[in-house]
Amino acid sequence: MYSFMGGGLFCAIVGNILLVVSTATDYWMQYRLSGNYAHQGLWRYCMSNKCYMQTDSIAYWNATRAFMILSGMSCFAGIIAGIMSFAHFSSFERFNRSFAAGIMFFVSTFFVLLGMAIYTGVTINFLGRRFGDWRFSWSYILGWVAMLMTFFAGIFYICAYRMCECRRGTSPR
C-alpha cells in the first residue's frame, strides 16, 4: 500500500511541477512570421527576441489558461491529501485520504486534458492554417506529459485505496 502511495506521490509532484512549468512558459507553439522565428505561450508571444503580453481576450486562450490553473490547483490539493494519507488519524476513519487523493488527481487529469484539447483543436484548425511553418514546442509537450503523470498518480492512489479496503475486509473485527 505504501509503495503505491509513494509512487503516486512521486508522479503527482513531478506532474504538478510540469503543469506549472508548462503553463508559465512561452513555448507552446513555434512558427516563422515574416522570415523571423517566433514562439508563443498562454501568456506571452515573442518575436525577434522581444516578448509581449497576450492582450487579446480570446476565449480558447482563456479556457486553456483556466483549465491549466485548475489542474495545477487540484493536483496540489491531491498532493496534500496524498501526504496526509500516510498518517492514520482515528477521527478520519470514515474519510479515506488515499481515495480522495486519487480522485483529485483524476480531476487534475481531466482539467489538463480539457485545456490541452482546446488548445490543440484551435491551433491545428485556426493557427496552423494561418502560419505555414509551425510546430508545437516543449511547453506544450510538458503539458501532455503532466497529464500522464497526474493520471498515473491517480491510478497509484486508487490502487492503494483498494489494497487498504481489501485488508480491512479480511481483518477480524
Residue ranges of each PLM-predicted region?
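Juxtamembrane membrane-interface segments at transmembrane-helix boundaries in membrane proteins
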Residues: 1, 48-65, 127-143
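Signature of small four-pass
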Residues: 1-29, 61-123, 143-146, 150-164
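A surface-exposed beta-alpha-beta supersecondary segment
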Residues: 22-65
